[in-house]
């Protein structure tokens, strides 16, 4: 099953996350199919959340299942999530 979820990167005590499309069996920070954007939970910049909405909509149409957090972030960017 293909999932849209967060993959952590950044340094200790300074988390950043990639919003990625990956196989559900892969580890959290393992390889991914496509990078859809990034998220900074500390909101240190104006662009703390950036998502390629066209590609996100494409993957959702292909049947990718977003995690609860990814769903919330996609909705915040205006992506229609069922």
From Swiss-Prot:
UniProt keyword list: Ribonucleoprotein, Ribosomal protein
Family: Belongs to the bacterial ribosomal protein bS16 family.
Claim: DNA-binding is one of the keywords in the record: no
Highest taxon above the source species: Bacteria
HAMAP family in the record: Ribosomal_bS16
A GO MF label: structural constituent of ribosome
One of the GO biological process terms: translation
InterPro entries: Ribosomal_bS16 (IPR000307), Ribosomal_bS16_dom_sf (IPR023803)
Protein name: Small ribosomal subunit protein bS16
Keyword Ribonucleoprotein listed: yes
Gene Ontology cellular-component annotations: cytoplasm; small ribosomal subunit
């Amino acid at each position: 099953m293909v999932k849209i979820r967060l993959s952590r990167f950044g340094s200790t005590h300074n988390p950043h996350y990639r919003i990625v499309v990956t196989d559900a069996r892969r580890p959290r920070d393992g390889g991914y199919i496509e990078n859809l954007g990034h998220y900074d939970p500390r909101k240190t910049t104006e662009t703390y959340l950036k998502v390629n909405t066209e590609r996100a909509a494409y993957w959702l149409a292909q049947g990718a299942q977003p995690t609860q957090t990814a769903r919330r972030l996609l909705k915040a960017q205006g992506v229609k999530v069922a």
